[in-house]
């Protein structure tokens, strides 16, 4: 059984990217996106990690909404395959659409909880939208379908399984570390340097950073590298250029890390 993965994006609609995967065995490391992501399970079962109370089993017809920056992963059961779809939407664009729909300020999708929905009509609407995005329909038709879907979304759809980080003071303390890691993607600063920025010991920083982000400083920076790699690949940069610019040892190293986070090779993603 061969798996198949395809991506859709259009420079005329930069606020959305979509993906379809069939009979996939690919597993993802815990990661995040800089978009609001909505995933749908089409076939097979998978395990979602990122919920406050531990892993959650997902079944066909389930939707999962994950706000930007939330660390999560969704993988098939051991030895099994699954099929799924994934939409990545710009959160600010979503809020603008909801404001148009309601005549009121839209919800802050960056602060929404992670939600799992079992609502079959919403899943069917999602599938119809994705069929349209991957079709040869005019971009105006695709944009209209997308606006209708987002406008119909209820921020209370589904069950909330994880809220946004609640410790604002902790977030403030590790923010300088996050800024440095994001600014210096081409290499990893020493842990002691990062700890000094936060006024903590190395051990304290690792614990605090994981509480604030869900990842260690090193893992978080790798996640940021992959997010930047996706942007650069969409711009048409070569794999070799991206690998070098983001501090990977070589192109092979870049491909391994990218696939572990994205569930697809850089070449598959760039097509």
Would you name each region that the model predicts?
Residues 2-107:
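N-terminal regulatory/effector-sensing and dimerization cores
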């Amino acid at each position: 059984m061969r798996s198949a993965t395809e991506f859709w994006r259009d420079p005329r609609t930069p606020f959305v990217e979509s993906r379809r995967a069939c009979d996939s065995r690919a597993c993802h490391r815990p990661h995040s996106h800089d978009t609001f992501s909505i995933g749908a399970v089409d076939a097979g079962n998978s395990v979602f990690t990122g919920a406050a109370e531990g892993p959650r089993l997902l079944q066909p017809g389930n939707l999962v909404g994950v706000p930007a920056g939330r660390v999560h992963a969704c993988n098939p059961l051991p030895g099994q395959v699954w099929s799924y779809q994934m939409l990545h939407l710009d959160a600010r664009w979503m809020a603008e659409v909801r404001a148009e729909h309601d005549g009121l300020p839209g919800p802050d999708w960056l602060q929404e909880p992670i939600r799992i929905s079992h609502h079959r009509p919403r899943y069917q609407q999602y599938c119809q939208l994705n069929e349209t995005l991957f079709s040869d329909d005019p971009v105006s038709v695709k944009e209209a379908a997308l606006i209708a879907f987002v406008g119909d979304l209820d921020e209370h759809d589904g069950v909330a399984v994880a809220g946004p980080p609640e410790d604002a003071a902790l977030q403030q303390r590790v923010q300088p570390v996050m800024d440095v890691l994001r600014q210096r993607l081409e290499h990893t600063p020493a842990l002691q340097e990062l700890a000094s920025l936060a006024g903590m010991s190395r051990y304290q920083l690792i614990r605090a950073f994981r509480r604030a982000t869900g990842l260690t400083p090193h893992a978080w920076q790798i996640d940021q590298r992959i997010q930047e790699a996706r942007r650069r690949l969409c711009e048409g940069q070569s794999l070799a250029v991206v690998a070098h610019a983001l501090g990977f040892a070589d192109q092979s190293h870049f491909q391994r890390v990218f696939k572990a986070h994205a569930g697809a090779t850089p070449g598959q993603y760039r097509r």
